[in-house]
Amino acid sequence: YQGVQKVDGVEYFFWSDGQLATYDYDGISTATSNNYLVSYNKNGIVIEKVKIEGNKWIKFNNNWYYYDQDLYPYQGIHTIGDATYYFLSNGQLATSGFEGNITTVREGNKYYAYDYTGKVVEQVDIVGNKWIEFNGGKYYFDSELTPYSGIQTIDGVEYYFNYGQLAEYLDEVVTSGDTLAYVRDGKVIEKAKFKDNELIYLNGNCYYYYLNDAGYYYPYDGEYTVDGKSLYFIYGMLQTSDSDEILTDYRNDYLYAYNN
């Protein structure tokens, strides 16, 4: 048996080797078989079966699908009627959860943003060495259309990027390669090179990192002795207070107390 077969009045789904399609976990699995979309449970029992037809919307397993006239699933960006949609590789319309949610995706040399219904609401060409405004953010790519990441200099100004997007939302200390930097509104305000097992002073705070065997800098976390003093760090930053107040922190089954 292969695909959907009826046994004793019940429809089951079988793999190509004749084995009943069962699994140990709860939930519903889906498959395509003989131009049908099929969903089945962990016992291999068919829950839903919908015939695949070309050039029409198909509702299956509470999702929408679209196939061309040769019954190939739509993938990526496609225009149907007066609207443009984004589809996953299996032909499923890429809905994004809840109303008001916007998801972005790169297809070739374009960026697309689609809403919770899968409808494309914005698109922009990706060009190199030029600021691109998209979905409320700013992006930058090099001449090979590779997105900027980490600290980059544009027109003499240092910026910080996350996968091509200017990190305008940050107001914190970040890492970029061998550099520790304070970033605000996407710009690098202050920076310092990492030092192995040496205190680093940045933006009014003190940091402590070490170089691991893989060649990456990692923050100290917890109590460590530096220059004969017992200091307490959380993710690399020395913990201090603005007064003589004693502060505490519970970590790794220990309660630590520290002052300014």
Regions found by a protein language model. Give the residues of each.
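Extracellular adhesion/carbohydrate-binding repeat motifs centered on closely spaced tryptophans
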Residues: 1-260
